[in-house]
Amino acid sequence: MEFDHEIHPTAIIHPNAKLAENIKIGAYSIIGKFVELGEGTEIGNHVSITGHTKIGKSNKIFHSSSIGEQPQDMKYKDQETCLEIGDRNTIREFCTINTGTVEGNKKTLIGNDNWIMAYVHIAHDCIVKNNIVIANNATLAGHVEIDNYVVLGGFTAIHQFCKIGEHAITMGGTLLSQDVLPYVRAVSRGGMAFPNGINSEGLRRRGFTSEAIN
């Protein structure tokens, strides 16, 4: 079946890659053999998408991002692992998102409606759910789990295996080596993260009443 695509002539698309309808791919981007792109997804210039990577509908991936490369894990021995990205995500410039490992169900997962800003790194086996904002230069180590409606401030760094509860927020430059409870605002002091009250402003923006917040 022939689909109507906008693919720059300098882009390199492996013949086995699976492209749905209305795909846009910019100059010098590379789409690998085992990649699947959902309907309406737009790929910018100089983007590399490789590995066993499945990307859903209406995503926008900006230039120079690297999606689906092998995990940065010294235990990794070229096993077949994957990355799955849902629908309507925005992935800005120079982001890196790796596939999973056999120690982590072989899969890295990104949900729907997430806003991932420039220079973000999402490591192997992470689970990033839905409606999440990850600001510039944030780093998620392996096996990190981010629940729905979380906001991660710029330069937030999260240690492996940490979990961030829904509706939580981290201030810019927060260094996390432990889990963060839902609804909490986390800040760094002296190189360590501490809870600093409730994410009241974020909860109000999402329709929580004052009674519910209090």
Q: What name fits each language-model region?
A:
Residues N22:
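A glycine-/small-residue-rich N-terminal strand-loop-strand element
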Residues G26:
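Basic, Lys/Arg-rich alpha-helical nucleic-acid-recognition elements, primarily the DNA-binding modules
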Residues M1-E6, I12, K18, E42-N130, ...:
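Glycine-rich hexapeptide-repeat left-handed beta-helix
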